[in-house]
């Protein structure tokens, strides 16, 4: 019989059955647990926390983007935009989102478009675990568009183009020390930008929107969470036209007279304390504040290296940014005689006709003081002594006034404390003698403007009090602040800080100051058509290592019969044919007055002598040959502007008999095409 083979039976049949049963039970339990977990998760998502699930889903599709708020604008009193905000873009990258094969091409393209270093860009993009890195800030629209185009063309994810704003100063190198500047985050760092940072800074907004990787909005719904609110706008008391006249004249003086330690100019409204112009030259362009403007200093800094160069650059930048008009002290020199004179008149210690003797020098308690340039004026009145700026005269005036009265009026004119102007960086102290420390020698020296140091702003503020009826005004540069709806947030009104001298004293001082310009040392400050009062100053810098260092200054007030504006010009260490304030600074002040007064609606009124000196009547040269007509005009101190190639003059403009300023150009038409009536209209 044939045998068949069967598989052997397990020798442990009961044990195998038990294991199979356990496996089935465990598998069932796992299935139940998984299904239960899934049910619990669905219950949580659908019933207990539906919004949390939606938020997490949206977070993968939506981007929370800051909408930068524009910084407030700054305007001049005559409506010129001085500081504004411009839209720009920031380019950032998320290297972990950028495809490996695009790292090097992206580094090459972005470094070329954005003008940034290739190696540094490649290093940033190669950090594959990085979520964010900055490539370049403050990119203009054309560069941002170029980056977008490259990203679109190469389907590059991880490059972000974010909207931002940057501060722009449309007038360039204009009012730098006054306006100041901001940092890359648009926070004020200097000048008005710092002083009014809280007002100028807006409130950023936020937008939740679907975006692709390089910053494009995707075609889907988005919701704005909060609109950006721009900062408040500020209107200054500064007039751009007056500021331009001041800066132009001051820069020319710095160049012509080789001023070594910068020059200062301030124009103040006499009755209100409003600053119409303020300048320190040389200064800087607030669009590029870290570039040294002074070529000599820039070359000196660039000649250094390493840490030495860094320190020198920082020192030069700080000096360039410094608003010398409010931050530095100086010896006012003979301009200060106005204060001594006003105090002595107000107390009755002297009158305008009090007489003094100048022998060229005077001895006080064993110390000799000489008159400027060794002049011997002999017997002179107070008016004459002020006109010729006689030192011995004012030493005697100071002695009659007395040290206590001198110190009291020094304080009353605001010369011991900061003015409190709405600008940062004003020096908080001045240098002066108190009555208990002042002997006869110190009183003598202080009486004519030496041995005390004040700020330039303090000095012109005090001079305004001398001529405006005796009121010490609060100087200020901001006129008003408005929000984006043009609602007035703040309106600055003139503030009288003190009544320093009697109005009668002020009236006498105006007459004496006019004499300085008409008959004395201030003749270079005269302006045709206006009555001008002033005072010259040439002060020694007592703390300078250079014994010949001087400050040439001049203060002018016009119209002196009804004062509207005061102008202070100071050239610190001029290297010219003279250091006289009347000779160097007087013409600068006169130029500012001549150009500025008409802009303020104050028209000239000429005397007969001025009319003859500055004006002439246009002769009739029609029918004349052109060369002969030009020669005839030159006899009247006029120039010819010949139009066309004709032989004879057919018509002229202005017409014959018109009164014009000498030096004017007269149009001579040889073609017959000139229509004078059109020009007159």
Question: Positions of the model-derived regions?
Answer:
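A non-catalytic structural micro-motif
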Residues: 638-642
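Conserved "repeat-terminator" motif of extracellular CCP/Sushi domains
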Residues: 660-680
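Conserved SxxK-family serine transpeptidase/carboxypeptidase catalytic domain
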Residues: 133-151, 160-177, 233, 415-419, ...
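Short secondary-structure junction motifs
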Residues: 156, 260-263, 351-353, 418, ...
């Amino acid at each position: 019989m044939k045998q068949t083979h069967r598989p052997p039976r397990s020798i442990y049949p009961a044990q195998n059955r038990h294991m199979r049963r356990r496996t089935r039970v465990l598998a069932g339990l796992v299935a139940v647990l998984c299904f239960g977990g899934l049910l619990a998760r669905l219950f949580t998502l659908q019933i207990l926390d539906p919004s949390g699930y939606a938020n997490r889903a949206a977070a993968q599709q939506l981007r929370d983007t800051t909408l930068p708020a524009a910084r407030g604008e700054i305007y001049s009193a005559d409506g010129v935009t001085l500081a504004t905000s411009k839209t720009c873009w920031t380019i950032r990258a998320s290297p972990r989102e950028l495809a490996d094969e695009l790292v090097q091409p992206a580094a090459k393209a972005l470094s070329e478009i954005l003008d940034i270093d290739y190696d540094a860009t490649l290093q940033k993009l190669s950090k594959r675990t990085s979520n964010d890195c900055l490539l370049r800030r403050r990119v203009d629209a054309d560069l941002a568009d170029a980056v977008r185009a490259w990203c679109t063309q190469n389907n590059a994810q991880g490059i972000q183009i974010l909207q931002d704003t940057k501060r722009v100063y449309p007038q360039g190198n204009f009012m730098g020390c006054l306006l100041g500047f901001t940092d890359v985050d648009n926070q004020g760092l200097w000048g008005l930008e710092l002083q009014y940072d809280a007002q100028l800074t807006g409130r950023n907004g936020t937008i939740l929107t679907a975006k692709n990787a390089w910053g494009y909005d995707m075609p889907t719904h988005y919701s704005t969470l909060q609109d950006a609110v721009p900062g408040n706008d500020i209107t200054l008391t500064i007039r751009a036209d007056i500021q331009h006249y001041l800066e132009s004249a001051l820069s020319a003086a710095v160049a012509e007279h080789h001023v070594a330690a910068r020059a200062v100019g301030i124009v103040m409204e006499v009755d209100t304390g409003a600053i119409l112009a303020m300048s320190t030259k040389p200064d800087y362009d607030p669009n590029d504040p870290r570039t040294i403007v002074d070529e000599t200093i820039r070359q000196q800094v660039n000649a250094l290296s390493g840490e030495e160069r860094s320190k020198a650059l920082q020192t030069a930048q700080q000096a360039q940014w410094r608003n010398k008009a409010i931050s530095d002290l100086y010896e006012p020199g003979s301009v200060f005689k106005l204060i001594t004179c006003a105090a002595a008149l107000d107390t009755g210690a002297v009158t305008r006709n009090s007489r003094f003797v100048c022998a060229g020098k005077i001895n006080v308690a064993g110390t000799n003081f000489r008159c400027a340039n060794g002049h011997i004026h002999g017997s002179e009145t107070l008016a004459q002594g002020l006109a010729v700026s006689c030192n011995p005269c004012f030493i005697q005036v100071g002695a009659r006034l007395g040290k206590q009265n001198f110190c009291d009026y020094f304080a009353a004119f605001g010369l011991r404390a900061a003015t409190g102007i709405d600008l940062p960086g004003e020096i908080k102290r001045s240098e002066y003698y108190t009555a208990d420390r002042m002997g006869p020698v110190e009183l003598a020296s202080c009486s004519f403007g030496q041995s005390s140091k004040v700020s330039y702003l303090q000095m012109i503020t005090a001079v305004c009090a001398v001529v405006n009826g005796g009121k010490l005004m609060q100087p200020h540069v901001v006129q008003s602040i408005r929000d984006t709806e043009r609602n007035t947030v703040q309106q600055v009104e003139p503030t009288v800080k003190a009544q320093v001298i009697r109005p009668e004293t002020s009236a006498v001082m105006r007459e004496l100051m006019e004499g300085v310009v008409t008959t004395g040392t201030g003749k270079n400050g005269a302006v045709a058509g206006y009555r001008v009062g002033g005072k010259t100053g040439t002060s020694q810098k007592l703390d300078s290592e250079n014994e010949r260092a001087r400050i040439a200054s001049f203060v002018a007030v016009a119209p002196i019969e009804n004062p509207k504006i005061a102008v202070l010009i100071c050239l610190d260490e001029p290297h010219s044919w003279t250091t006289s304030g009347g000779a160097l600074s007087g013409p600068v002040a006169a130029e500012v007055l001549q150009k500025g007064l008409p802009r303020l609606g104050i028209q000239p009124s000429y005397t007969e002598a001025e009319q003859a000196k500055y004006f002439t009547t246009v002769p009739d040269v029609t029918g004349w040959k052109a060369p002969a007509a030009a020669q005839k005009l030159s006899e009247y101190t006029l120039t010819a502007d010949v139009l066309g190639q004709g032989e004879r003059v057919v018509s002229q403009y202005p017409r014959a008999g018109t009164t014009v300023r000498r030096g004017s150009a007269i149009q001579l038409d040889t073609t017959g095409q000139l229509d004078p009536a059109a020009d007159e209209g």
